Amino acid sequence: NHFRDDTSDVEQAEGAASLLAYNKGDKHETALQLGWNVDTLERRLLLLNCAPTVRSALNERRIKLGHAELLAGLPANRQDKVLGGVIEHKVPVEVLKKQLGQFAKRLSDAIFDTAQCIGCPHNSAQQASLFDESIGDGFCQHPSHYDELTMAALEARAVPLRDQFPVVRFVRLEDGFAPLTVGPDGPMGVGATQYTACKGCENFGCSLSAMAGSYGEVHESLCFDAA
């Protein structure tokens, strides 16, 4: 082992990264020289996703390794913000894990191509496979970017719908949207003649779900003027 007994995990990570660069990216050789297995090397290197403020806090023993492992998957600016709260309120590791899990987005709910998420530092799969502390596998820890990708996918789905309907509305949970479905028959039936007229109305259209669990679901034949 090349490190002092009191070397912090971050200092080990930084030293390992330098040795890995010297070895031209050969992780097996680097791990061998450090007296580690490759998993231990990968675990340490993943800590380098921590923002400088988080690294310093871990070096100074103001946070635990578990805190740093959980923060490593967040965008750097969010790491800084969350770190301040962790230190100020002495937030335990388990509480932080629960809080971060509430903001993460499930990749299984995504309607965009998640192939781009493989290897992303914000994909919790990396932390789940290597760290003792993580929010679990299959989550995006960069919710604003996830939302951007979701909206881009929804916009793409809306293009052909706009050729069919005067109104195409994205529906979010906070909208409290209650659709008014119209048709020629059924409980809200208006008759064939009126329904034909409705389809030409500027308030006739469809909704496209922007809500987790139903992303991309389309509800057609809606009236957006219930007055």
Which ranges hold each PLM region?
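Amphipathic, charge-rich alpha-helical segments that serve as recognition/docking helices
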Residues: 1-60, 65-79, 87
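Histidine (H) residue identity feature
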Residues: 2, 28, 67, 89, ...
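Residue-identity detector for glutamine
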Residues: 12, 33, 42, 79, ...
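A general structural signal for short secondary-structure boundary/capping elements
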Residues: 76-78, 89-93, 117-120
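C-terminal helicase lobe and adjacent C-terminal extensions/tails of nucleic-acid helicase motors
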Residues: 87-108
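Conserved TIR/SEFIR loop-to-helix hotspot centered on a Trp-containing motif
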Residues: 109-227
